[in-house]
């Protein structure tokens, strides 16, 4: 589901395998399938990986601007919540009147060493769970250099252990359940510092000790490479995948812990808990638990298969996700909003409907992958398009593109379920303030941009096969509209 975050999957790559192991289907023995081939003309760089940029000053300026503005946006939102009752307008007017430098000097969050140590302990704890909890080894997709990597997918166990310890410690009086909310400003400093350090470390590791040299991408610009990343799958040892750990452990597990802490904070300062904060948190939990139950699915998303590990993913997963995806509970903890039974039921129904759509779409993809396209979708044989692509080692592989079921309605219909669920999460906060709706607005922009990236990547990867697919499935996200 994103993003940065919980990204929505790149679900077009349903199956990838070496063609020498695939029987010839061109004689029509597989009903309703066609084969489209694609050959690359580049020897030094496979065209369907991340694009090579040549370090123009414009790219460098853009990366520097994003790496500067994004942390400031996080700080700006915290100031709006803690100093101006969540009003973005009042916060902006005050900043314009005081000047940005004086405004930040007076209102910016302050960190402390105790919180830094606590955050370091959190990272260490999650690293121990990642490494030592029982796990199955799941396969990702072939990288552009031809590597098929195994991943430790024990995220659900890590989520359960973490939340069980949090709840037990809170119930036994060993831990203040509102501890995260009460130390939120210092935590924002800690996560930002770590996000920048992590980005720098990933940059240096890619130069000094790369895991898979063939899957690195260099642009010629230090800033662009720092932002977008160089290594595709940086690792320590055989199975400690740096990208999967940071994308899928500390930040996303913290998401629901932060929600619970702000629920406790609302109770401590107001004396009651509203149905709106419970509803928003329930939808978050549904989202996160589903992510971990289907963690092997995440290995086939654009985050793992396409994006290299730089500031975009490192800082985004460690800072943007836990700070901006929890805005609804942050806002409701200090601005309690009670929903009528009808409103609560409507929002709940919409949110669950979005989730069911998202899960149904993913199920169809997984079914086609497991059966190699020989399955029934909506009572009819699956309509699949078989396409080929090459990896950097020169081997040709086959993938399946679904053209029926949900995937016959739109090429990215999975994003529609994402958006319905995202807007439902924000709707629990009411319509009096724009701030808690930031998540839905961000997801809309992110998913549309991701569509463009996905379309470009698949076009390069599959060539004429992708053109044929687009002719069969004309709509992008919303059938009949876009």
Model-found features: residue ranges?
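Membrane-anchoring alpha-helices and their flanking helix-loop junctions
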Residues: 2-404, 420-482
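A short amphipathic helical element positioned immediately N-terminal to and/or at the very start
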Residues: 405-410
């Amino acid at each position: 589901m994103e993003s940065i975050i919980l990204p929505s999957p790149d679900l077009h790559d349903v199956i990838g395998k070496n063609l020498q192991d695939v029987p010839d289907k061109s004689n029509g023995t597989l009903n309703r399938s066609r084969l489209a081939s694609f050959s690359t003309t580049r020897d030094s760089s496979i065209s369907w990986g991340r694009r090579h940029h040549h370090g123009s000053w414009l790219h460098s300026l853009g990366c520097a601007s994003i790496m500067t503005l994004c942390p400031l946006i996080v700080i700006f939102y915290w100031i709006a919540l803690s100093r101006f009752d969540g009003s973005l307008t009042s916060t902006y007017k005050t900043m314009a009147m005081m000047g940005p430098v004086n405004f930040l000097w007076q209102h910016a969050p302050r960190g402390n060493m105790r919180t830094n140590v606590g955050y370091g302990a959190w990272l260490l704890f999650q690293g121990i769970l990642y490494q030592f909890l029982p796990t199955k080894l799941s396969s990702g997709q072939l990288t552009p250099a031809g590597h098929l990597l195994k991943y430790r997918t024990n995220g659900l166990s890590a989520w359960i252990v973490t939340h069980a310890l949090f709840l037990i410690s809170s119930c036994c009086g060993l831990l203040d359940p509102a501890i995260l909310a009460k130390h939120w400003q210092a935590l924002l400093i800690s996560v930002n510092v770590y996000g920048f350090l992590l980005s720098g470390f990933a940059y240096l590791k890619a130069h000094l000790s790369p895991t898979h040299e063939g899957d690195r991408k260099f642009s010629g610009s230090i800033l662009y490479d720092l932002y977008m990343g160089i290594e595709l799958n940086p690792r320590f040892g055989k199975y400690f995948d740096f990208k999967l750990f940071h994308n899928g452990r500390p930040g996303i597990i913290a998401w629901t812990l932060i929600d619970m802490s702000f629920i406790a904070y609302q109770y401590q300062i107001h004396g009651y808990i509203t149905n709106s904060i419970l509803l928003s948190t329930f939808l978050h939990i549904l989202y996160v638990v589903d992510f971990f139950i289907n963690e092997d699915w995440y290995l086939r998303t654009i985050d793992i298969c396409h994006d290299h590990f730089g500031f975009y993913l490192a800082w985004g997963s460690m800072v943007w996700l836990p700070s901006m995806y929890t805005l609804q509970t942050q806002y409701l903890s200090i601005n309690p909003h009670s929903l009528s039974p009808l409103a609560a039921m409507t929002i709940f129904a919409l949110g669950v409907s979005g989730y069911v759509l998202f899960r149904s779409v993913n199920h169809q993809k997984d079914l086609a992958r497991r059966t190699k396209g020989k399955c029934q979708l909506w009572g009819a044989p699956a309509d699949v398009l078989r396409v080929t692509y090459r990896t950097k080692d020169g081997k040709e592989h086959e993938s399946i593109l679904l053209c029926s079921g949900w995937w016959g309605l739109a090429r990215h219909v999975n994003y529609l379920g994402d958006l319905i669920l995202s807007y439902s999460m924000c709707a629990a906060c009411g319509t009096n303030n724009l701030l808690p709706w930031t998540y839905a607005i961000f997801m809309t922009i992110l998913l549309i941009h991701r569509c463009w990236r996905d379309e470009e990547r698949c076009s390069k990867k599959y060539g004429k096969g992708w053109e044929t697919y687009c002719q069969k499935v004309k709509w992008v996200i919303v059938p009949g509209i876009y």
